[in-house]
Swiss-Prot record:
GO molecular function: [protein-PII] uridylyltransferase activity; phosphoric diester hydrolase activity
Annotated gene: glnD
Catalysed conversion reaction: [protein-PII]-L-tyrosine + UTP = [protein-PII]-uridylyl-L-tyrosine + diphosphate; [protein-PII]-uridylyl-L-tyrosine + H2O = [protein-PII]-L-tyrosine + UMP + H(+)
Protein family (similarity comment): Belongs to the GlnD family.
GO biological process, one term: regulation of nitrogen utilization
Protein name in the entry: Bifunctional uridylyltransferase/uridylyl-removing enzyme
Enzyme nomenclature, EC number: 2.7.7.59, 3.1.4.-
Gene3D superfamilies, per database record: 3.30.70.260, Beta Polymerase, domain 2, Hypothetical protein af1432, Nucleotidyltransferases domain 2
Essential cofactor(s): Mg(2+)
Keywords linked to the UniProt accession: Hydrolase, Magnesium, Multifunctional enzyme, Nucleotidyltransferase, Repeat, Transferase
Annotated stretches, region: Uridylyl-removing: 325-681
Organism: Burkholderia thailandensis (strain ATCC 700388 / DSM 13276 / CCUG 48851 / CIP 106301 / E264)
Regulation of its function: Uridylyltransferase (UTase) activity is inhibited by glutamine, while glutamine activates uridylyl-removing (UR) activity.
NCBIfam families to which the protein is assigned, alphabetical: PRK03059.1, UTase_glnD
UniProt region (Uridylyltransferase), positions on chain: 1-324
Length: 858
């Protein structure tokens, strides 16, 4: 008897068939260099599947199934939504509703991510008039199956109702609002390939506006119309192709709709494009640089196109308002306009002049589309001869030396690629991401952010932000020297080697070529060479040690250098990430500045005189607090010189006022107050010392979501620990005054317990840290005097890290004398001063280092 195999149910067969067809296309998406034909093929396969379902559901010929949005355009990324409109005649039988619901349900069953609407023609027109998003999706409507007459009637009504001018204004406003959500920059760490500035949505917006205005629906048609040039059309197609391919590969790699280029996928996406890591750059950094360049080009060309379309839709009624540079530039409706299309070809020196005029001319708010286009198409003019032209070098220095508008001018020069063509080494770092868990901007954006920060110090309306910096820069002669240093301080990033040394060479050449001589040139070069030094000294060294201050003062040499380095350092740290700067770092830097300035002014770094000064200032404060005249002696007699040097007079007075009655306390005394230096909590702990005390305090802070910024640990002569911590709450918007009492009670109770130290919790790393982990490092060495050991730790930041370190030290009975906790974005670079007892044993040193590496490993 012959066996027969039953045919699969139609639904299963249909689903398997579509799934197989889609899988074959997805496999090709992974390697295709041009995905547009595949997007069309996926759209056609989806059309076919929907037609079959339409007929199976018995939907009448009087209805129409319409593709809208990207599906209407005939382009589907691997996991894009499939947007459809079921177009109804004005009158229809109610039983059709059930069939339509069945059709949509079967489409979902097929595996399609359906976005559906069911409307009559009148309803479509009404919805479109109320919502520009609906109006946009219908702009590219395409009939799949059903009534041609109904569809054509709908399109006729739609076109009649479409107001091209109103549509233009609505879409431009929508684009600006969308850009604002992404901080108006394409240079996000995790850009949205579709929605971010310079992404696919910007290109689609231009084509929607052009289509609505009747100017065409492709780059070729816009070229024919004269809205763009052949070269611009090629650039647009090339960058659009790259962005489409990148988006499609993200979908395939993620196995779902994924438009954000998240850290987790950047390496895989880079490898799919053939990028491989080099000693200087990760594969992901190479891909991101290509993405940023594409987004930058799209932004440039979109600006030109939108202005051109606007000029066609809203013809200007007035002509030239004033001549700014005879035969070269005029102002037209607040925009800088070239006098003739070939100005830059005939006068290459006019290229930089354009930015000088933009910067220096009141009422000029930007460059016109005509000027932007001429700049874009003058790239061949910006050659070696142009860079060497003394006129251009003079103009560039004029741009740097203007009293205002410098930041805007340099940003515009970068956006138009002129800055990178004038400074070729700057061009090398445009779009270069730094996956160092510290910087959140590309190198070029970071440099311009530092320039902006220095300029901001000099602007009166921003003086309240950093009053000390503003006070210093007002009296700083020729501040443009700082701007040059800002331009070059990181210009050598990504080349391999020491970027400070390489950048110093670039800066020296720039100064020589631009007539910067003598002390100004020497200062620029010195600042680039040492731009990291002040931060490292302030955050990693014991600045209470007079020798540390003396060495730094010897390096700096004079007040002008000190002030310049301080201003550059503050601007640099603030320009890395919104998370890195805090008031505590500001205090460390300002304290170092003031201490160094005193030495440069002739003050001798003498510990005895400094101790005497601090004590006198503290006593004056205690008298104001009505503390009895000799009450401080009981406590002060138990404190060494190091205590008085590590604390300022205000802290000494506060701690003395709290403790002078409790010098021999039987129980722990814990006091907390909002930190005088900024948004943090200052915590004082006074208790009989023990080897696990520091670890126990860190355990409490860890369990309660408090991050330690600074720890100053002191042991009195009679065996008490007098420890001072600066901590912050990881949750935002906390009122430290409200939690001070709670910390005092809970921490005192915790210290009264005799329980063993708990196991450290290995908190979760951020996605950035998981994707780009740094190699943990531990360095343990004796200090120069042999009195203490210095422990340096660098690792990915995570909850519980400090306690993990403290616990290892406690287990080996290694005392912590001081700690500088330096959090740089997603990484930490902590420095501990340890008691030297026992650490002279090399075997113990190796054991401690090994266990620390194990404790901080991710």
């Amino acid at each position: 008897m012959s066996a027969s195999v039953a045919a699969p149910p139609p639904a299963l067969s249909r689903k398997a068939e579509f799934k197989a067809a889609k899988a074959e296309l997805l496999a090709r998406f992974q390697t295709a260099t041009n995905v547009t034909p595949l997007m069309h093929a996926l759209s056609r396969a989806t059309d076919d599947a929907l037609r079959r379902l339409w007929h199976e559901c018995g939907l009448p010929a009087t209805l129409a199934l319409v593709a809208v949005g990207g599906f209407g355009r005939g382009e589907l990324s691997p996991h894009s939504d499939v947007d459809i409109l079921v177009l109804l005649p004005d009158a229809h039988a109610r039983e059709l509703d059930e069939r339509i619901e069945r059709f949509i349900g079967m489409a979902w069953d097929l595996g399609l991510e359906i976005g559906s609407s069911v409307r009559t023609v009148d309803q479509c027109i009404e919805e479109a008039s109320q919502d520009v998003t609906v109006q946009t999706s219908l702009l590219e409507a395409r009939r799949i199956v059903g009534s041609t007459a109904l569809f054509e009637r709908f399109m006729l009504r739609y076109r009649e109702a479409l107001d091209a001018r109103a549509f233009f204004q609505a879409k431009v406003l929508e684009m600006r609002q969308r850009h604002a959500k992404f901080q108006d920059t394409p240079y996000s760490l995790e850009p949205n390939v579709k929605e971010s500035p310079g992404g696919l949505r910007d290109l689609q917006t231009i084509l929607w506006i052009a289509r609505a205005a009747g100017f065409g629906s492709s780059w070729r048609e816009l070229d024919t119309r004269g809205l763009i040039t052949d070269r611009e059309a090629r650039e647009l197609r090339r960058n659009e192709g790259f962005l489409k391919t990148l988006r499609a590969r993200l979908h395939v790699i993620a196995g779902r709709r994924q438009d954000i280029l998240v850290f987790d996928l950047q390496t895989q996406a880079a490898e799919s494009f053939g990028y491989r890591p080099t000693p200087a750059k990760r594969a992901s950094e190479q891909l991101m640089r290509r993405y940023y360049w594409a987004a930058k080009a799209v932004t440039q060309l979109a600006t030109i196109l939108i202005q051109n379309i606007e000029a066609q839709l809203f013809p200007a009624t007035s002509g030239v308002t004033r001549v700014l540079s005879p035969g070269r530039f005029v102002e037209k409706q607040g925009m800088l306009e070239i006098a003739a299309d070939d100005v830059f070809e005939r006068h290459p020196d006019a290229i930089l002049e354009a930015f000088l005029l933009y910067e220096a001319t009141r009422g000029v708010k930007g460059l016109s589309a005509r000027t932007l286009r001429a700049l874009y198409n003058s790239r061949d003019v910006m050659n070696n001869a142009w860079r060497r032209d003394p006129r251009n070098r003079h103009t560039f220095m004029q741009i740097l030396q203007q009293p205002e508008g410098i930041t805007h001018a340099f940003r515009l020069m970068n956006q138009t690629s002129v800055l990178g063509r004038y400074l070729l080494n700057f061009r090398r770092i445009v779009g270069q991401m730094q996956h160092d868990l510290y910087h959140v901007y590309t190198v070029d954006q970071h440099i311009l952010m530092v320039l902006r920060n220095i300029r901001r110090f000099a602007v009166a309306e921003h003086a309240h932000e950093y009053p000390f910096c503003s006070q210093l820069i007002v009296n700083f002669e020729r501040p443009w020297v700082l701007y040059v240093a800002a331009l070059f301080h990181d210009i050598a990033k990504g080349r391999g080697g020491d970027h400070s040394a390489l950048g110093m060479t670039d800066a020296r050449r720039f100064c020589r070529e631009h007539g910067i001589e003598g002390g100004d040139a020497a200062l620029v070069v010195w600042l680039v060479q040492h731009h990291l030094t002040m931060s490292q000294v302030a955050q990693k060294q014991d600045t209470s040690d007079p020798e540390v201050i003396k060495r730094f003062a010897d390096l700096v040499g004079n007040e002008r250098r000190l002030t310049a380095l301080y201003l550059l350092t503050v601007a640099d740290i603030r320009g890395t990430s919104p998370k890195v700067w805090n008031t505590w770092k500001g205090k460390l830097l300002e304290d170092l500045y003031r201490a160094t300035l005193a030495v440069l002014g002739g003050a001798q770094p003498d510990a005895h005189s400094e101790l005497k000064t601090r004590q006198e200032e503290a006593l004056a404060l205690l008298r104001l607090e009505t503390v009895p005249p000799d009450a401080h002696r009981a406590l002060w007699d138990q404190l060494d010189v190091g205590y008085f040097l590590r604390h300022d007079a205000a802290d000494i007075a506060w701690q003395t006022r709290v403790l002078y009655r409790h010098v021999a306390a039987d129980t722990a005394i814990v006091r907390a107050r909002p930190s005088p230096v900024g948004d943090a909590l200052q915590v004082l702990v006074y208790v009989k010392d023990r080897s696990d005390l520091f670890a126990g305090i860190c355990a409490y802070f860890d369990r309660n979501g408090l991050s330690v910024l600074d720890a100053r640990v002191n042991t009195t002569r009679h065996g008490y620990a007098l420890d001072n911590f600066i901590v912050t709450q990881t949750e935002r918007d906390v009122q430290y005054r409200d939690i001070a009492n709670l910390v005092e009670q809970q921490l005192a109770a915790r210290l009264a317990e005799s329980a063993p130290l708990p196991e450290p919790s290995k908190g979760r790393l951020s996605r950035l840290s998981r994707t780009f982990p740094i190699t943990p490092r531990v360095d343990l060495r004796a200090d120069e005097r042999g009195q203490y050991y210095i422990l340096s730790v660098s690792a990915n930041d995570r909850p519980g890290l400090l306690y993990s370190i403290a616990r290892v030290l406690a287990e080996h009975r290694v005392g912590v004398h001081a700690a500088r906790i330096n959090t740089l974005g997603e990484r930490v670079e902590d420095v501990f001063m340890l008691d030297g007892t026992g650490l002279s044993d090399n075997r113990l040193q190796i054991q401690v280092e090994t266990e620390l590496l194990r404790a901080i490993a991710v």
